[in-house]
């Protein structure tokens, strides 16, 4: 039995003649826009209702992703995405009832979500940027593996996972390179990794491997500090984003090396890739983000007051 909200989205997409993924992206965009209205135009009478709709839409968008994480057996993200909808609804109701008494931390969080979603949406929706992030991630990881003497690897030609069609080489894709005019499959643009002799490694690089999600959390948190001068915010961004990228390259290299060298390893039914990618690397990333936040609190004490 299909989940009711996913079924409703499917019915809407069928009536519009577009893919489910496109409707979900429209929900995300609408949520970001209405939250942005609530953040940047919060003195207007309609701002609380706009924010309430935005929280609900963003919660619904994340909730609709939970089915995918159930399929790939990622319990951490299942819990986080499934809980987003009730939390979003609760925040929307609270916004309407307590708009004039809303603490500055909630106002900041509203802007944080907006300015985290906007850059991710742009990167995802502009194929050239999307492919650029994927290529940079794969190339940097390959270079680190080679430099550290952990093996001889090479990048295979970039592939495109088309929604409902399958995977084809990028050279055969005739889609628009500047505007995403068609939905992509689960992997989107991706680069398989190979050994130097051409044998395939069971790891590919997709947009999610670029740590873009981690970067946009800090982008949103820093940009939303509207009371802080831009020069201080830019300095914090220049420190946070390159650091996240470098740490992510080490993370990816570790996952590749462990997966490639411990093929038969299992722990409670999990293979090496599933264990490192879904558990070890996630908890390691959360710890690294925690340390990053502590460092940023020294640069931006205002950020600490909102968290």
Give residue spans per PLM region.
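Hydrophobic N-terminal alpha-helices or hydrophobic patches in metabolic proteins across all domains
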Residues: 1-307
């Amino acid at each position: 039995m299909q989940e009711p909200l996913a079924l409703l989205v499917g019915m809407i997409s069928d009536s519009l003649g577009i893919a489910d993924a496109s409707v979900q992206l429209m929900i995300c965009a609408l949520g970001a826009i209405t939250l942005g209205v609530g953040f940047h135009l919060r003195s207007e009478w309609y701002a609380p209702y706009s924010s309430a709709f935005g929280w609900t839409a963003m919660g619904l968008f994340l909730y609709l992703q939970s089915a995918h994480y159930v399929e790939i057996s990622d319990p951490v993200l299942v819990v986080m995405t499934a809980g987003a909808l009730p939390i979003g609804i609760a925040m929307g109701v609270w916004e309407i009832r307590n708009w004039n008494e809303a603490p500055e931390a909630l106002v900041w969080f509203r802007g944080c979500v907006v300015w985290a979603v906007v850059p991710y949406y742009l990167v995802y929706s502009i194929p050239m940027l999307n492919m650029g992030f994927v290529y940079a991630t794969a190339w940097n990881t390959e270079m680190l593996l080679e430099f550290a003497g952990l093996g001889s690897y090479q990048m295979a030609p970039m592939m495109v996972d088309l929604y409902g069609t399958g995977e084809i080489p990028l050279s055969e894709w005739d889609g628009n390179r500047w505007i995403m005019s068609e939905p992509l499959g689960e992997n989107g643009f991706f680069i398989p990794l190979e050994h130097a002799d051409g044998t395939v490694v069971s790891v590919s690089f997709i947009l999610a491997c670029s740590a873009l999600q981690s970067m946009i959390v800090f982008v949103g948190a820093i940009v939303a500090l509207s009371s802080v001068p831009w020069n201080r915010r830019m300095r914090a961004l220049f420190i946070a984003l390159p650091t996240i990228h470098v740490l992510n390259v080490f993370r990816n290299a570790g996952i590749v090396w462990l997966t490639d060298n411990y093929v038969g390893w299992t722990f409670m039914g999990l293979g090496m890739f599933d264990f490192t990618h879904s558990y070890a690397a996630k908890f390691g990333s959360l710890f690294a983000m925690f340390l990053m936040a502590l460092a940023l609190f020294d640069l931006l004490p205002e950020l600490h007051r909102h968290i």
